[in-house]
A protein has these predicted regions:
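Amphipathic alpha-helical segments in well-structured domains
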Residues: 52, 81-82
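N-terminal active-site segment of His-dependent metallophosphoesterases
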Residues: 1-64, 72-75
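Hydrophobic/aromatic beta-strand patches that form the interior of the parallel beta-sheet core
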Residues: 36, 64-66, 96, 113
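Conserved catalytic scaffold of divalent metal-dependent phosphoesterases
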Residues: 9-11, 71, 82-114
Length: 114
């Protein structure tokens, strides 16, 4: 099983670059079976979740993520606690925080644990 692993997309800071599209393109070129993003997608939950939605729509393989420190902040809601923000992410099935996913290919299994 080919696992693609990337982190620190920072789509808000890098808004002038097609990072989501390029990530999907490179992962497909590498014949990725599953893509894992190891944090720091954006500094707002809405942008992070939109990016994951878009990335999944461009990929023919599952996309999972674990929020990083930047994903756990919210510039638009300074009074939001990390516990509240974490609850938002944990509702998303693609978020690995506190979860595990078992994937299989060719009779072999891989556990992704967040």
């Amino acid at each position: 099983m080919r696992v693609g692993l990337i982190s620190d997309l920072h789509i808000d800071i890098n808004k002038d670059y097609p990072i989501v599209e390029l990530t999907a393109e490179v992962a497909a070129e590498q014949r990725t079976d599953v893509l894992v993003i190891a944090g720091d997608i954006s500094e707002t939950q809405a942008q992070t979740l939109q990016a994951i939605d878009k990335l999944q729509s461009l990929c023919e393989f599952p996309v999972y993520y674990v929020p990083g420190n930047h994903d756990m902040w919210n510039k638009n809601c300074p009074e939001c606690t990390t516990e509240e923000i974490d609850c938002i992410y944990r509702e998303d099935l693609r978020c690995l925080s506190g979860k595990q996913v078992i994937l299989g290919k060719d009779g072999r299994q891989l556990a992704l644990v967040g």
